Structure formats: structure tokens, C-alpha cells
């Protein structure tokens, strides 16, 4: 059972918005109704006269200090730092919902009413919604320096020549949508001051230690003067890997004498003013021989980062790096540009660029298989990454690669050959199709980012162990896995290990936070090191108490035993702990601490199999069966792993078939910033979700495991697209596959 299960299902778990303090005030933004322009004048007299309003701040009142918001590890290299293009409030609005002022009031309703009473005169500027328009010679600059944020290329050599020399070439133009994370808990931060020099922030964040640093930078105060407390988090999926409302909450309390100020965003504001997934436009080429050997492929990517940089070009760059592991024995070229537009800012979202890139690669490979008459599973087996291969861009060796086994296992469970045969030569309105797609994904951010994790273990008087880690639990089950790691390594029952889920930057060992599917991989060495050290101290103390050599003793199921007679307990940990605490001379509280940097980053692999039916007349896709098979190394907790995979599959189905932020191409106004008009899949839309695992030990890992949090979403859309193509003969390269888009494509193909 998850260690946080009871607290959550009984309602005892306290999330940020559950915290109410005496004298607490509430802040609400005044936001731009236009996507690009200047606030010429502002009139807040009516708002200020409303009873209960404490203060109104505009762009003129906030520090003139640009700051970056991305949840990336800090770097000593100035050239590698994120672009600082944010301000707390701005006169130059760059997207629909940009913030120009903020109202603080005694209660939330008054703050909302007052914000609505603020009137602003606007000077509108040209609106740009696509990267193509942003790069036009006559495009209005959204930021100083132009609309091209960054561009990069990576290549294994003369890739175009290799593609041209192959027996068959395939090309494709692919487009993916802007979508929102839609985590259950919205974005909330609460800040106050206990003295004149220090600000405390309680926040729903994935990255408390990074929040501390960014708040310090935004307000130009020492980082140590900021304390960040992360409570229970109701999901993030990357949106809370940005520093969102914490700097504003900190600014407000500092200006209002240290009183508690809460900044909570509505669901509509989460759509407009937090982060989204980057929309990609990808032009791809691929060369394949008649026997199915992939000779080479190239991708040219345009990434839409929206109005502010956030994670910016790192998304496009990461997508190209992560897919390189998938089919490493071929030539590979990847070029990408990231552009500013007047859309809501895009940032990190589950998969971090990989879903977009994999959609293009796996669509092209499937089209090549169809043209060459090769089974889609066979062409992937022929080219799949294997142990001993190397990343073609970096030369990093792949020590564990279970992709062939995933394909074979999935093919058997899914009954691929039988289902594929049933889908041949179909006529009529209802047509079935099967599809498959693969992925590769890394286990942290190294070497692009510094990977560090810390752990502290303290033994209580009853022999139980408290664990403090900077790695954040945000709903994915990290605390449960951490308790298993410590319990196994020390030699105690899991029930005797308590992970302190609340991170506090004043107390908790340093860790950047939850992102990049890094948590269990990067935290594991620190937890294991601390656990081994604590075990060593326990046995040393037991040796003194029992007049034994420490070499003769070990710890099993919470009891000290002789190595040669493990079935006979000599002493319980409770008895040992009481002696360590209260013996008049020997001992002390037994504890251990470790901080370790990780310099390995193995890839995980896997695939999705899908069986679906297309109703051509209704332009509707119904998924009959879907299966994900993963190589994530040793599976630490099968139930948690299954839950992660099912959640990712559901998100992948949403991205493939339903979800899209509808943004007016001319005005930049978001037309569906709510959960009624933004179509997410609900229970009736999802089939039975199936998962399976291929457990191949990863030798670079502390416990033999690799990434699992993000990978399940990555191949789903491509597999669905490929199945729709098999069912209808129509290759649709733009997501999502909504009824409207299916109608347009089927009409062009002459099916309707």
C-alpha cells in the first residue's frame, strides 16, 4: 500500500489551499484581454474604494528585475542559464491573460470583484500565433532581440546522403497541438514573514529548492532568506516544474508588512497563465532498405514556446536527444528552432519533447513498413536498440536495452498476428486497425543538468526510521518507493520506515525536485548510501551491547542476528535504540546523511500496441484494446508501476484523440480555457488499460531500475495514428484525431 494512501483517502492530507492563517489575505490578478499590446493607462480608483481592499500593485510597483522561471538546476556557466524574460507584472502584455496588476483584499471574493473593477486602456500590437509567422522578416518583435529564441543542430554526419542512398525514402509533415496539464489541484502559493529578513512560502510545487533560488533572484534577496515548504501536491505533470506564483506571493507579503498572502489561480487562469505543452511542427525524412533496415532519418523541428521562454528550447533539444537511443545503428540528423509567439507560455509537460518527436519518427517508420510490405513489429525489431549499442550522437554505451523483448512480449500478449490478419481487406463503414509504436527516454537530465540528491535518516526511540529527502512526492508514489529502498537496505520492515513527505528548504537535504523521470534513479544512490551508513552504525552499537564482533552481526526484519544464525533474533531495534538514546555513556541518536551527484543516465524503452475501430461516417475512433510494455529495469513496486503506466496511457489517448487548446489564430484569445470546453477523456472514453514489463537489470542503477514516470505517454499517439492508417488507408499527421480532423482527412481521401 502507498505510504500516503490513508491520509489522502480520508481527507487528512493537507494541500496548500488547505492552509489558512490568522489575518491571511488573498490576491487576484488583473489580466489582459488581448494577446499583444501595451497598457496605456490604468484606473483603479473604483477598485481601491471597495471595502476590504488592502492594496493594488501595477507594473510600476514591482522590481525591475527580469528572471527565469524554468525548473532547471542552476549552472555556474552563464552561457547555459535560462533566459530571464519574466517580470512579476508587465505593461507590455504578450499573451491573452498576461498579468498587469494584482489586488490584495481581506477575502477572496472582494479581491475578485476589485480586480474586475480595474479599467485599462490598451494599445494593441500585431498578434503572432505560429512560429512561421514569428520568423517572417516583417514580424513584430515580441521580445527585444527578435522572435527566434534559439536554434540548434545535431548530426552523425552526412545524413542526407545516407537517406538518399537507401532503397526507399519516406517524408512527412507533422503537427502537434497546444495542450494543458489539467492536474487536479490548481496552482496555489501562500507566503508570510516571521521577521524582517526572511520569507516563508508554502506552495504546490515540484521544485521547492529551485523555487527558493528563483524567488531570491526575482526579489534580489539572498537565497537563504527564502524558506519554501512543499506540502501534499495534487499533480503537476511538469506545469509545477516552473516557478509560478511563489515570487508574487513573496513580493506581496514583503510589501504588506509580512502578513500572510495567498495567491490561488482559477482553472481558467491555469489555462491562460501557467504553462502548456509546446506545439511542434516537424518535417521528417527517412531512408529504409527493402529488407527493413533503417539507414537514416532527419527531423526539422519548429517549436512554439509562446509568450515567454519558460523551458524554451530545452524541450525541442531534449526531444531530439532522447529519441536518438531508439534506433541507434543508423544515421541521424536533428535541427530545431524555438520561437516566441503570442500564445500562453509553453513549458515542461510529461515526456518533455519526446512525445512530439516520437510521433513523427514512428509515423514515418510505419509508413515505410506499409510501403515495403513489412510487418510493423518486424521492422522495429530489425532496428531496435540492443545492449552494447551506443547513442549515435554522444557515443554513450547502452548497458541495458529491453526493447526487442518488449516488442516480442507485447506481440504475444496482444495477439498481434491474429488481430492484424483480422484487419485485412476491410470494406464498409466500421473498420478495425492495429498499430504499434516504440519509444526511448532517459532517466534524468545529466549531462545537460547537474544531478544531485540528498538523504537524511534518523532513528527514533522505538527503532523506527525517519527519512528526509529533497526529492518530492507529487502523487507519483516516490515516498513509497523511497521507504522500500531504505527498508531493504537497512534490513527493517517497510512499516518501520517513515518518509517525511513535506519538503522544507530550511531543513530538507538538497535535491532539484520532481522532473525528467529522475526521482527514483537519482535519489536512490543517496538513500542507499545513507541507509548503508545507518546500518553500519546500528551494527556497531549492537556489537558493543552484545560483546560481539560487528563482522558477525547483521540486521534482518528489524532484529539484530548472527550472520551464521539469521533465524535467531538477538535484539530488537527498539531495544537497541533505547540504549543508544539513554545509556549514560555510550551511543547517541543514530543517524546518517548522504548527498551524491549522479553522472549516468540510462535510457528506458517500451512500446504501445493498440486495436481500434474507426466509424467512417461518424468520424469517430473507438479503442478496443491498448497495451503498453516497458523496459524500466528492475520494477521496484509493481502496483505503482502499473498505475504510472495506466495514467500515462490515458494522457496519451487524450493527446491523440481529444485534447487541444483552441486559440484564435488572429486574436490569440484562448476559446476553451475550462474543463467543459477543453475535451479531456473521461471514464467512458478510455478502454481497459493493460501494461506489462520486461525486467532487465540496469547495471548503472543503485537498484537496477530506470525511468518510468513519463515514458508511458510517449508512444501512444503514434500507435493510434498508425492503427487509424491501417483501418482506413489514410495517414493523418496532425494531432489530435478529432472528428472534425477525421472528417477533413476522410473527405480529401474520398472515403466520405
Swiss-Prot record:
Molecular function GO terms recorded: iron ion binding; xanthine dehydrogenase activity
List UniProt keywords, sorted A-Z. Metal-binding, Molybdenum, NAD, Oxidoreductase, Purine metabolism, Purine salvage
Q: Which SUPFAM superfamilies match?
A: CO dehydrogenase molybdoprotein N-domain-like, Molybdenum cofactor-binding domain
Pathway assignment: Purine metabolism; hypoxanthine degradation; urate from hypoxanthine: step 1/2; Purine metabolism; hypoxanthine degradation; urate from hypoxanthine: step 2/2
Q: What is its EC number?
A: 1.17.1.4
In the UniProt record, which is one GO cellular component term?
Answer: xanthine dehydrogenase complex
Against SMART domains, the record matches this protein to: Ald_Xan_dh_C
| Reactions accelerated catalytically | xanthine + NAD(+) + H2O = urate + NADH + H(+); hypoxanthine + NAD(+) + H2O = xanthine + NADH + H(+)
Q: What class of enzyme is it?
A: oxidoreductase
**Chain residues that bind Mo-molybdopterin:** 206, 237, 350, 516
Presence of keyword Metal-binding:
yes
Superkingdom per UniProt? Bacteria
Q: Which Pfam family, giving just one, matches this sequence?
A: MoCoBD_1
Record-level GO BP terms: hypoxanthine catabolic process; purine ribonucleoside salvage
Entry coiled-coil feature ranges: none
Requisite cofactors: Mo-molybdopterin
Could you give the cofactor binding note from the entry? Binds 1 Mo-molybdopterin (Mo-MPT) cofactor per subunit.
Subunit notes for this chain?
Heterotrimer of XdhA, XdhB and XdhC.
The function of this protein is:
Presumed to be a dehydrogenase, but possibly an oxidase. Participates in limited purine salvage (requires aspartate) but does not support aerobic growth on purines as the sole carbon source (purine catabolism).
The family assignment reads: Belongs to the xanthine dehydrogenase family.
Q: What is this protein called?
A: Xanthine dehydrogenase molybdenum-binding subunit
Q: What is the primary gene name for this protein? A: xdhA
Amino acid at each position: 500500500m502507498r505510504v500516503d494512501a490513508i491520509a489522502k483517502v480520508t481527507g487528512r492530507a493537507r494541500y496548500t489551499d488547505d492552509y489558512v492563517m490568522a489575518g491571511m489575505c488573498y490576491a487576484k490578478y488583473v489580466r489582459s484581454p488581448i494577446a499583444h499590446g501595451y497598457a496605456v493607462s490604468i484606473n483603479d480608483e473604483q477598485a481601491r474604494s471597495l471595502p476590504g481592499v488592502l492594496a493594488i500593485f501595477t507594473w510600476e510597483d514591482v522590481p525591475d528585475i527580469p528572471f527565469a522561471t524554468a525548473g532547471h538546476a542552476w549552472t555556474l556557466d552563464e552561457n547555459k542559464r535560462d533566459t530571464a524574460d519574466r517580470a512579476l507584472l508587465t505593461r507590455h502584455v504578450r499573451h491573452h491573460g498576461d498579468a498587469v496588476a494584482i489586488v490584495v483584499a481581506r477575502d477572496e471574493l472582494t479581491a475578485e470583484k476589485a480586480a474586475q473593477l480595474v479599467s485599462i486602456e490598451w494599445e494593441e500590437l500585431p498578434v503572432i500565433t505560429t512560429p512561421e509567422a514569428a520568423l517572417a522578416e516583417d514580424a513584430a518583435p515580441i521580445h527585444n532581440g527578435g522572435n527566434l529564441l534559439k536554434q540548434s543542430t545535431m548530426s552523425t554526419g552526412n545524413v542526407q546522403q545516407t537517406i538518399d542512398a537507401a532503397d526507399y525514402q519516406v517524408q512527412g509533415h507533422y503537427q502537434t497541438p497546444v495542450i494543458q496539464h489539467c492536474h487536479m489541484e490548481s496552482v496555489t502559493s501562500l507566503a508570510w514573514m516571521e521577521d524582517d529578513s526572511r520569507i516563508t512560502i508554502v506552495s504546490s510545487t515540484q521544485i521547492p529548492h529551485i523555487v527558493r533560488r528563483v524567488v531570491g533572484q526575482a526579489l534580489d534577496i539572498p537565497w537563504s532568506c527564502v524558506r519554501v515548504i512543499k506540502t501534499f501536491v495534487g499533480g503537476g505533470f511538469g506545469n509545477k516544474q516552473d516557478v509560478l506564483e511563489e515570487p508574487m506571493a513573496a513580493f506581496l507579503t514583503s510589501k504588506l508588512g509580512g502578513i500572510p498572502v495567498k495567491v490561488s489561480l482559477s482553472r481558467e487562469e491555469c489555462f491562460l497563465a501557467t504553462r502548456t505543452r509546446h506545439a511542434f511542427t516537424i518535417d521528417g525524412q527517412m531512408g529504409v532498405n527493402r529488407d527493413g533496415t533503417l539507414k537514416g532519418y532527419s527531423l526539422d523541428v519548429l517549436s512554439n514556446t509562446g509568450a515567454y521562454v519558460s523551458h524554451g528550447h530545452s524541450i525541442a533539444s531534449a526531444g531530439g536527444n532522447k529519441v536518438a537511443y531508439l534506433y541507434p545503428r543508423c544515421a541521424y540528423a536533428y535541427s530545431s528552432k524555438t520561437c516566441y509567439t503570442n500564445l500562453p507560455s509553453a513549458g515542461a509537460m510529461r515526456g518533455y519533447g519526446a512525445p512530439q518527436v516520437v510521433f513523427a519518427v514512428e509515423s514515418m517508420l510505419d509508413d515505410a513498413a506499409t510501403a515495403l510490405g513489412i510487418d510493423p513489429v518486424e521492422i522495429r525489431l530489425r532496428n531496435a536498440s540492443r545492449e552494447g549499442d551506443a547513442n549515435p550522437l554522444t557515443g554513450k554505451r547502452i548497458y541495458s536495452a529491453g526493447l526487442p523483448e518488449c516488442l516480442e512480449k507485447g506481440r504475444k500478449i496482444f495477439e498481434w498476428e491474429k488481430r492484424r490478419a483480422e484487419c485485412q481487406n476491410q470494406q464498409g463503414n466500421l473498420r478495425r486497425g492495429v498499430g504499434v509504436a516504440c519509444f526511448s527516454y532517459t532517466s534524468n537530465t545529466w549531462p545537460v543538468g547537474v544531478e544531485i540528491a540528498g538523504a537524511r535518516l534518523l532513528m527514533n526511540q522505538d527503532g523506527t526510521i525517519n527519512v528526509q529527502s529533497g526529492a518530492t512526492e507529487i502523487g507519483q508514489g516516490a515516498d513509497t518507493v523511497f521507504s522500500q529502498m531504505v527498508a531493504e537496505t537497512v534490513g527493517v520492515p517497510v512499516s518501520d520506515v517513515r518518509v517525511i513527505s513535506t519538503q522544507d528548504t530550511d531543513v530538507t537535504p538538497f535535491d532539484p525536485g520532481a522532473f525528467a523521470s529522475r526521482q527514483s534513479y537519482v535519489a536512490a544512490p543517496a538513500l542507499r548510501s545513507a541507509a548503508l551508513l545507518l546500518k553500519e552504525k546500528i551494527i556497531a552499537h549492537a556489537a558493543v551491547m552484545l560483546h560481539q564482533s560487528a563482522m558477525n552481526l547483521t540486521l534482518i526484519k528489524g532484529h539484530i542476528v548472527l550472520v551464521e544464525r539469521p533465524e535467531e533474533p538477538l535484539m530488537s531495534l527498539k531495544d537497541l535504540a533505547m540504549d543508544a538514546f539513554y545509556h549514560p555513556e555510550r551511543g547517541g541518536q543514530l543517524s546518517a546523511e548522504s548527498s551524491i551527484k549522479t553522472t549516468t543516465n540510462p535510457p528506458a524503452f517500451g512500446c504501445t500496441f493498440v486495436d481500434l475501430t474507426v466509424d467512417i461516417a461518424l468520424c469517430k475512433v473507438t479503442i478496443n484494446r491498448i497495451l503498453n510494455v516497458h523496459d524500466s529495469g528492475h520494477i521496484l513496486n509493481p502496483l505503482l508501476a502499473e498505475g504510472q503506466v495506466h495514467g500515462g496511457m490515458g494522457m496519451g489517448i487524450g493527446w491523440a484523440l481529444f485534447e487541444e487548446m483552441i486559440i484564435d489564430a488572429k486574436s490569440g484569445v484562448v476559446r476553451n480555457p475550462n474543463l467543459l470546453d477543453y475535451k479531456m477523456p473521461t471514464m467512458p472514453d478510455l478502454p481497459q488499460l493493460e501494461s506489462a514489463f520486461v525486467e532487465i537489470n540496469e547495471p548503472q542503477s543503485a537498484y537496477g531500475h530506470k525511468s518510468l514516470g513519463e515514458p508511458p505517454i510517449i508512444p501512444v499517439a503514434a500507435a493510434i495514428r498508425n492503427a487509424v492508417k491501417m483501418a482506413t488507408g489514410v495517414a493523418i499527421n496532425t494531432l489530435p484525431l478529432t472528428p472534425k480532423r477525421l472528417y477533413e482527412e476522410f473527405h480529401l481521401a474520398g472515403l466520405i
